[in-house]
């Protein structure tokens, strides 16, 4: 990614050993050497959040929360301001109340503040955050502590017009995952579909958006390096 000239990136950690300081500091050096900035961190443990953070078994929460403290510390070392959280699935075996969910999320927010990072709710299909109404209630509950990662493809998968979601949360969005689409395909490299990126950039500029944009697509079936190079050139040509 850095070799292609990208100046903004997200680090997706893949295992706990990558959270150790020597590894994280090497990542930071790699970014600095290329004049790039790490905007965000994505935990590898997103699939476990339902059972280990947003569930009532306290001992499991106590044992697991340290992993997120390490992610927040790693984000701080990288200079990243955002940590991406999926949260709980939409239907849990033991469904917790929204207030319980919001309180647990608030506990993550407080840990993030100690490292100077925003703990952000991403909109994700099949998770509670797939619902705009849920996100509105979360915003009301958390107030100024509510920060959001907006994902274009996830908005589509949740059944929404991405521009509706972006407009509703434009003042709370601190980070954006970009992808292209067509009526038939919901996730494509930017420039390969019909999504109106210029409209999105204009909307966020008008809202005085200070966050960044990263491309998030799934690599299966793509010549990744060539597609990223193409998408970078395409997006650079239309950014306002």
Residue positions per predicted region:
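Charged helix-capping and loop-helix junction motifs
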Residues: 22-26, 61, 65-68, 97-106, ...
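Active-site acidic/histidine proton-transfer and metal-coordination neighborhood
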Residues: 50-147
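Acidic/histidine-rich catalytic cores of soluble enzymes
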Residues: 8-9, 41, 107-197
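Short acidic/histidine-rich active-site segments
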Residues: 212-217
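N-terminal pre-domain/capping segments
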Residues: 1-76, 113, 144-147, 171, ...
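Acidic-and-aromatic substrate-binding clefts and catalytic sites of carbohydrate-active enzymes
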Residues: 12-26, 90-96, 126-131, 152-160, ...
């Amino acid at each position: 990614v850095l070799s292609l000239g990208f100046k903004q990136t997200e680090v997706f950690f893949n295992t706990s050993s990558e959270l150790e300081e020597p590894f994280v500091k090497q990542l930071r050096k790699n970014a600095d050497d290329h004049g790039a900035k790490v905007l965000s961190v994505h935990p590898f443990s997103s699939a476990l959040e339902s059972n280990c953070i947003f569930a009532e078994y306290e001992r499991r929460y106590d044992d697991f929360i340290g992993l997120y403290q390490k992610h927040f510390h790693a984000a701080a070392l990288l200079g990243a301001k955002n940590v991406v959280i999926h949260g709980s699935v939409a239907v849990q075996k033991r469904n917790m109340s929204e207030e319980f969910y919001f309180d647990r999320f608030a506990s993550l927010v407080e840990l993030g503040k100690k490292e100077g990072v925003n703990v952000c709710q991403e909109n994700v299909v099949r998770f509670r955050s797939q619902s705009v109404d849920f996100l509105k209630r979360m915003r009301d509950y958390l107030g100024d502590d509510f920060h959001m990662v907006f994902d274009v493809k996830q908005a589509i998968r949740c059944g929404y017009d991405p521009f509706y979601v972006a407009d509703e949360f434009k003042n709370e969005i601190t980070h954006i995952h970009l992808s292209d689409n067509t009526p038939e395909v919901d996730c494509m490299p930017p420039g390969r579909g019909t999504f109106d990126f210029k409209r999105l950039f204009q909307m966020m500029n008008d809202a005085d958006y200070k966050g960044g944009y990263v491309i998030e697509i799934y690599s299966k079936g793509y010549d990744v390096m060539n597609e990223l190079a193409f998408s970078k050139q395409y997006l650079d040509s239309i950014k306002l």
